[in-house]
Amino acid sequence: MPKIFRSLYVQVIIAIVLGILVGALFPKFGEALKPLGDIFVKLIKMVIAPIIFATVVSGVAHMRDTRKVGRVGGKALIYFEVVSTLALIIGMVVMNVLRPGAGMNVDPATLDTAGLTKYTEAAGEMTVWDHILKIIPDTLVSAFTGGELLPVLLVALLFGFALMRLGKLGDQILYGIDALNQVVFVILGFIMRLAPIGAFGAMAFTVGKYGLKSLTSLGYLMGSFYLTCLLFIFVVLGLIARAAGFSIFKLIRYIREELLIVLGTSSSESALPRLMMKLEHAGAEKSVVGLVVPTGYSFNLDGTSIYLTMAALFIAQATNTPLGLGEQLSLLAVLLLTSKGAAGVTGSGFITLAATLGAVGHVPVAGMALILGIDRFMSEARALTNFIGNAVATLVVARSENAVDMNRLTRALNGEDLPTTEPDVASEERGEGREIDSSRPVT
């Protein structure tokens, strides 16, 4: 096999193209391939919890200073709030300028809302206190079985703080956790070999079920959304990255394989473990990566923020629902809360939109039926923007803490120092992997 075809990057591109062709030419067969994408995403989710746990525990325990943990977490949350609020405002401004829904004159009473039931029910079942209580698991073990990131993060933080107090015994336990992390990353390498198959199945299902026509229907909204995401990435995040001393273009090139996985699965969560690995390799301290990335997947979803304001205003415009400045500010205030509860998984943005419209009351929830058919295609842009946003956030916070080796970052982004833990690299077969952190002695 030519060397170029051994690259995961090339394999995923080929898989996505083949998936589109199969879905377009054989729709029923394409729909039947959905389990391929589901299996890959489930396999990735299987290792996310142990990776986050081991990384956060190791990072917190090695910091030794609880004030530094609080400082890093505080900086991350402030960054998340400022940038995601900016994303919400940008989406709102674009919709007020372009007004893609104006002139549709849709009567909400005539819309078929049968397909919305599962989303509105899921949104209506959760209150603010329910979201808070979800962070606290019933048991230490249940944090790893519920499929949520925040409970794992909470347990990992507590575990890391506890190890800081245990002294030599904590050192021994920490060595074992670092070894566990290495084992899980080897497992991740096995799973990533299936990435092209997962991307193929997910893309074939999407095109097969919704058809290529759904790519062009309501195209003005889709075009506006994709354009807004691109502007946000290359202008807003680009300026932030430049201020922090790195190039957004080089960063995107550095994480291109992960971006293709996100594109194929429509889930930014599917590439979370590899993002953490690559940011560490690029020179960001493990402790900062372990805190910022998992937290960002709940609090720093820039693409979802843009989508929520644009979708809400599109529905209002299409149904001739007048929204003055006061109503739009009210919508923005609600979105500042609801957007923080959206996970980086497929469909979560639509559920969050249902919760937002239900809470605001001005915009008819039935109008969501207008975008149900194209939501799956907008999901790709949401996931990609979320993913890039979290990569930028981690490096910015690390830079503010002097917790990133800028020379190493420059070499990595220039392609001079690439990770050697790709799933198709021979070193994996020789048993080489991530180095166990043994900076704390085992006695």
Swiss-Prot record:
Lineage: Bacteria, Thermotogati, Deinococcota, Deinococci, Deinococcales
SUPFAM superfamilies the UniProt entry points to: Proton glutamate symport protein
Record PROSITE patterns: NA_DICARBOXYL_SYMP_1, NA_DICARBOXYL_SYMP_2
Organism the protein comes from: Deinococcus radiodurans (strain ATCC 13939 / DSM 20539 / JCM 16871 / CCUG 27074 / LMG 4051 / NBRC 15346 / NCIMB 9279 / VKM B-1422 / R1)
Keyword Coiled coil: no
Primary role: Responsible for the transport of dicarboxylates such as succinate, fumarate, and malate across the membrane.
Region annotation (Disordered) ranges: 415-443
Topology in membrane: Multi-pass membrane protein
Family to which the UniProt record says this protein belongs: Belongs to the dicarboxylate/amino acid:cation symporter (DAACS) (TC 2.A.23) family.
Gene: dctA
Cell membrane among keywords: yes
A Pfam family assignment: SDF
One record GO biological process: L-aspartate transmembrane transport
Protein name (database record): C4-dicarboxylate transport protein
